[in-house]
Amino acid sequence: MKKAIYFFLLLFSVLFVSCKSARNISATLSVAQKTLDTIPDSAPVQSVATADAVKEPQITGKADVAIPSADITRSIKNVNNKGVERVVYYDFSHPDVPESFEGFRIAFISDLHYESLLKEEGLKDLVRLLIELKPDILLMGGDYQEGCQFVKPLFKEIARVHPPMGIYGVLGNNDYERCHDDIVRTMEQYGMHVLEHKTDTLRKNGQQIIIAGVRDPFDRANMKSPTLALSPQDFVILLVHTPDYVEDVCVNNTDLALAGHTHGGQVRMLGVTPVLNSRYGKRFLTGLAYNSFRTPLIVTNGIGTSRMPIRVGAPAEIVMITLHKLK
């Protein structure tokens, strides 16, 4: 027993000492690019156990004068999978969701850090589960690799998912520190869309939603959100690696932001989280949060690990979001 206690004390100390200091973050501008006209109905998930939905309080959306409200419910389902431990489901209802996108299913993954805790077998299991979940679109939040040699095998496997509306991703701090060009080139080679301060318009039956992505959010040169040029009438999803960006930078016209980076703390025991990859402490640690303008933000625990290949109390996860028209 004493050995176990000493081990976790040592682990917390190592993680705390090795924690990188948080940096200020930001974002530049963009134009709608791609149009897609049809999308088939999504099939229900068969292989995950059911869980009771947890009702979240009603929240507000855009930081403009007339602020529409959103209604959000969440449920968590554990899975028997070598890549992730659970799927976190959100039903996201908002007035700006077009009727044609009722039931639109978004899969969101982040921080694979391949190969860290996530190895080849786990990656294949993860992809099998993503295929089974049948998302209409796959969004990715960056920090993909732990070495340039892992870039091609990672995206080659992820490309097997083939969601009807495509695969979109932003890059994380690891990806700007190394392998940036390899990652962008490989993603594009496999038909994926890299959103470095770009937006893309998804169309269905004459209606649209917009996906916006942030270039290196730790670079102060990127302090203008790509959402600022968009219409407040559109439903806009902002994809960014770190949740701090949504608080530090004006992200007007954003209806929902998605982020990773925190790993959910990666190691959490008895309420103690020795590593917090955010200047805001536990405020944006994991799950549903809001910036000061009450813009909803979903932060995922991610999948892989950094510094040490261990997760305690912060399960690796896929986030699934289903959009609904709030009337």
Which residue ranges define each predicted feature?
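Membrane-embedded segments
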Residues: G83-E85, V97-R185, Y190-H193
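Active-site neighborhood of phospho(di)ester-bond hydrolases with catalytic His/Asp-centered motifs
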Residues: I109-S110, I137-D143, G166-N173, L195-K198, ...
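Conserved beta-sheet core of the metallophosphoesterase superfamily
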Residues: A159, P243-T322, L326-K327
